[in-house]
């Protein structure tokens, strides 16, 4: 466990981690402070951040099991101690970490007798298990235990519905939330009009993300939500005669690029996030895993740097170069200077 003495800055607003610990492979804890804040700001930020931590961060789960030998979810199989329903519940608890986009397939094929655990899951290379010891089933006889799995990356909850049931395929209620819990508290100091606040934020995660990673992801998601309001056309800010609404033009990546070309000084490159571009989601996820979130981050890398990214291909670099050349009339350096 790591603890740091809390010191309050009287100048620049800043985040700081004051405590972090790993309780288990599936439970991480972090405590952060943000200061100095004006009166009322801590609650505003704390509420928004807690919502983003619990609802906006994506996670990876097993969402479906496939086996033609299982008649129904509540049946039992000779040679297996657990019922099918119990096995599904155990698979629901498996914690995965990935840069997967959408769905992917995995499988388990084990011969008994013995215990089946998370380490027996055969996964694609871009998915990893947080805790290999998680129990799935106990095989009491020399039988073959072979099932297919569907893995999905999403956010929030996925509740199985009747139309999701297929012959030999069983959906699992999935909880995609990497953050188990988040709380915020406020400490006030100072007197009168000079009163200020410190925001304390506590984050518990399931091990697929660290609290610091979760905080970064939630912050970026909040920024993405608010950017459209910063860059809408000025003409749309004023009501015309006989109008009772303010028309907001649809926010697109291309609109922002066009405005940047006209006057690069007005919009910082760091305010353009790559997930708003026309890049395929697979390319975006690869960039994100390398901490490339904005156009500024991208331009700070060479073609050679991009080719070193895991699962990145030459076609992906060409796709990025095409966008940069089309909308910025610039090229990405082949090598670092």
Swiss-Prot record:
One of its GO terms (biological process) is DNA-templated transcription. Keywords: Chloroplast, DNA-directed RNA polymerase, Nucleotidyltransferase, Plastid, Transcription, Transferase. The gene is rpoA. Its main location: plastid. It is found in: Plastid, Chloroplast. This is DNA-directed RNA polymerase subunit alpha. Residues 10-233 are annotated as: Alpha N-terminal domain (alpha-NTD). The lineage of its organism: Eukaryota, Viridiplantae, Streptophyta, Embryophyta, Tracheophyta. GO terms for cellular component: chloroplast; DNA-directed RNA polymerase complex; mitochondrion. InterPro entries: DNA-dir_RNA_pol_insert (IPR011262), DNA-dir_RNA_pol_RpoA/D/Rpb3 (IPR011263), DNA-dir_RpoA (IPR011773), RBP11-like (IPR036603), RNAP_asu_C (IPR011260), RNApol_insert_sf (IPR036643). One of its GO terms (molecular function) is DNA binding. Its EC number is 2.7.7.6. It comes from Nicotiana tabacum (Common tobacco). It catalyses: RNA(n) + a ribonucleoside 5'-triphosphate = RNA(n+1) + diphosphate.
């Amino acid at each position: 466990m790591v603890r740091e003495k809390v010191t309050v800055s009287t100048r620049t607003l800043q985040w700081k981690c004051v405590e972090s610990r790993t309780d288990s492979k599936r439970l991480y804890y972090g405590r952060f402070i943000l200061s100095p804040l004006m009166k009322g700001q801590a609650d505003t930020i704390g509420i928004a951040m807690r919502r983003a931590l619990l609802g906006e961060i994506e996670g990876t789960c097993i969402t479906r099991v496939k086996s033609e030998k299982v008649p129904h979810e509540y049946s039992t199989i000779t040679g297996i101690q657990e019922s099918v329903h119990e096995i599904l519940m155990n698979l629901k608890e498996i914690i995965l970490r990935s840069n997967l986009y959408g769905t992917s397939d995995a499988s388990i094929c084990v011969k008994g007798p013995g215990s089946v655990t998370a380490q027996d899951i055969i996964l694609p290379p871009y998915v990893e298990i947080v805790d290999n010891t998680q129990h799935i089933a106990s095989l009491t006889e020399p039988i073959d235990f072979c099932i297919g799995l569907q893995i999905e990356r999403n956010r929030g909850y996925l509740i199985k519905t009747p139309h999701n049931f297929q012959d030999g395929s069983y959906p699992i209620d999935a909880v995609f939330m990497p953050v188990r819990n988040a709380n915020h508290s406020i400490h006030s100091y100072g007197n009168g009009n000079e009163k200020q606040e410190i925001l304390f934020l506590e984050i518990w995660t399931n091990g697929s993300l660290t609290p610091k990673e979760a905080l970064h992801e939630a912050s970026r998601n909040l920024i993405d939500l608010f950017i459209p309001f910063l860059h809408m056309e000025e003409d749309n800010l004023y009501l015309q005669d006989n109008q009772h609404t303010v028309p907001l033009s649809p926010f697109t990546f291309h609109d922002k690029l066009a405005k940047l070309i006209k006057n690069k000084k007005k919009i910082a490159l760091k305010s353009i996030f790559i997930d708003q571009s026309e890049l395929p989601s697979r390319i975006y996820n690869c960039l994100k895993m390398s901490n490339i979130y904005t156009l500024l981050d991208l331009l700070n890398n060479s073609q050679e740097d991009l080719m070193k990214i895991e699962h990145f291909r030459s076609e992906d670099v060409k796709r990025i170069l095409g966008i940069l050349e089309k909308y910025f009339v610039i090229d990405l350096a082949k090598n670092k200077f």
